From Swiss-Prot:
The gene is RME1. The keyword Signal does not apply. A zinc finger (C2H2-type) spans 178-199, 206-234, 256-281. It comes from Saccharomyces cerevisiae (strain ATCC 204508 / S288c) (Baker's yeast). Transmembrane segments: none annotated. Changing C213S: Inactivates RME1. This is Zinc finger protein RME1.
């Protein structure tokens, strides 16, 4: 889910028992906030006196305000539809009732996906005061602008690519340390790193050829970094043409074998190798060592 906030005249659409409901209202709005709220579109209006003179002080305030306003509009229509269709045919899929929609206003934090929340926090730390403006195209699943970044920015590209977004979402609980090769800063998530690249208009020309890899968007500053990435992350995924275009010689990137004879694991990345040794073999309370101790005791 990718929220988007706009200072616009919004067209809020929802569905009730397969019937499309629509309300036009000059409000701040939040894109994709719930189960049945599919699309919001807007275009800036000059001289619209109904718009507030100033933005809320924080991003979460913006989202909460737009959520409450949008729910007020949609819930009214949903309540009318719910009253008129209280008896539905048997087997019809249950729909979200207006009171259930209204009750969701306090769940805003849980509705925002973790990667987007990381970016909100990153923007707040940087003292950002973003305005999120969406285009007037209604048939789209994501906003045209994410946190004030244009559509061609790294952040927007990450969120507009379903395969890349799926890869990021699958690994969102695993936080790493991403080093910027242009400065000394480090970042806990890929999205924060992408926001940093956008902040300084940094473009890295060497892109990963794997379709679902985030680094096809973020790229690398030098070809050696790309080759190292592909050798450690995508061995087995690269076809012959990709290896030729990368000038990749796999033998230059040998695997690291676990030093413990009883363990036969091999690692392509040095950090993964060190983490394995520290957590599995040098940790007396690891599951591996506990099982090994039990086996040795049984053989006595």
């Amino acid at each position: 889910m990718s929220p988007c906030y706009g200072q616009n005249s919004a067209i809020a659409k929802g569905s009730w028992n397969r019937e499309v409901l629509q309300e036009v209202q000059p409000i701040y709005h939040w894109h994709d906030f719930g189960q049945n709220m599919k699309e919001y579109s807007a275009s800036p209006l000059e001289g619209d006196s109904s718009l507030p003179s100033s933005l809320p002080s924080s991003t979460e305030d913006c989202l909460l305000l737009s959520l409450e306003n949008t729910i007020t509009v949609i819930a009214g229509n949903q309540r009318q539809a719910y009253d008129s269709t209280s008896s539905t045919e048997e087997g019809t899929a249950p729909q979200l009732r207006p009171d259930e929609i209204a009750d969701s206003t306090h769940c805003i934090t849980s509705l925002v996906d973790p990667e987007f929340r990381d970016l909100i926090n990153y923007g707040r730390q940087k003292g950002a005061n973003p305005v999120f403006i969406e285009s007037n195209t209604t048939e789209q699943s994501h906003s045209q602008c994410i946190l004030g970044y244009p559509q061609k920015s790294h952040v927007a590209q990450l969120y507009h690519d379903p395969k890349v977004l799926s890869t990021i979402s699958e690994g969102q609980t695993k936080r790493g340390s991403y080093h910027c090769s242009h400065c000394s800063e480090k970042f806990a998530t890929l999205v924060e790193f992408a926001a940093h690249l956008d902040e300084f208009n940094l473009e890295r020309p060497c892109k990963c050829p794997i379709e679902q890899c985030p680094w096809k968007i973020l790229g690398f500053q030098q070809a050696t970094g790309l080759r190292r990435h592909c050798a450690s992350q995508h061995i087995g995924e690269l076809d012959i043409e990709m290896e030729k275009s990368l000038n990749l010689k796999v033998e230059k990137y040998p695997g690291l074998n676990c030093p413990f004879p009883i363990c036969q694991k091999t690692f392509r990345r040095k950090d993964a190798y060190k983490r394995h040794v520290a957590m599995v073999h040098n940790n007396a309370d690891s599951r591996f060592n506990k099982r090994l101790k039990k086996i040795l005791n049984n053989t006595k």
